[in-house]
Amino acid sequence: LQILEGTEQRVVALFNTIRADDRHTGVVELMRDYGPRRRFEDVGMLLFDLDVQTPKAVLASVLHYSKLESYLTSEDRVFKFIQTFITGKTAIPPASDYEPDKWTLSRERAPFGKGLGLLAGQPCQFALQPIVEPSEGKISSLEALIRGNDGGSPEHFFRSLDREQIYEVDLQTKAWTFALAQKLGIGSHKLAVNLLPMSLVNVPGAVEFLVTQIKKHNLQPEQVIIEVTENEMISGFNQFNSAIKQLRAEGVGLAIDDFGSGYAGLSLLTRFQPDKLKIDREIVSDIHLSGPKQAIVKSIISCCTDLEITLVAEGIEKIEEW
């Protein structure tokens, strides 16, 4: 455990130097604090060896050199980290033995053939993104990401619509997704489609429409996963929950998308438990460098394990993140 103090620019530069040094592995930033004064002002460098000194002696020395009053140290997060580390209340994970630069990544080229053009009358494009089961080395499902016909983002596509059209169009695009999956020939792979949660509430007969379109395009309801995003507040939760129950009764799977980025978070998870939970990519990005992100994801993993919810990490682009 290292405590670095100083101006932000110098501390960040020193931290990056330490992290880049080949003699150090698994260097993670646990916290970054902005205090009115240094905790060990003018002390210089102090080294403590827990293989030589007792935890009690080290802790006494740390408190001796501290420039904070004793009543402040008991509530200070930095001192809590120090005390936990010294006393061994939290197990120290073993250093990672992987070397990312020695890994070989294999790519399955065009597993579903060449891309398809727009279907007749199709109002938007779709990007089919594979969801991979890394331990088995295979694609477990495909997520249909909506795009404007200019290739623009979903936000841009929906902003181009009148407000009263948004939920109706959101629902209608799922029919095109199912048609695309049928034409592409996804076999037994699962298909995940994103849906604004309020589309299930504001569009009459939404569930019946989805189930009809799934069967019309020769897909099995158990093959389809409806991903509801956290980025929209759910009003009328009773109606939403009723729609969820109907979908599940038909065999359709449910997922919470972008978990950790939106309105509901854990509150939504207490009210309905999906088959899958997808951690927002902002939490996953550079997780190998962030102690807070690791702690949060560790808690999410524990929660989903207890609830038997399959967990998906969004946006993994580096071996270190995996």
Where on the chain are the PLM-derived regions?
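Charge-rich, low-complexity N-terminal segments
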Residues: 1-123, 127-128, 132-135, 178, ...
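Short hydrophobic/aromatic beta-strand micro-patches
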Residues: 3-5, 147, 229
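Bacterial c-di-GMP phosphodiesterase EAL domain
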Residues: 103-217
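Charged helix-capping and loop-helix junction motifs
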Residues: 206-212, 239-242, 291-298
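The catalytic core of metal-dependent phosphodiesterases that act on cyclic dinucleotides
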Residues: 214-287, 307-322
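Alpha-helix-loop-beta-strand connector modules within alpha/beta enzyme cores
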Residues: 296-308
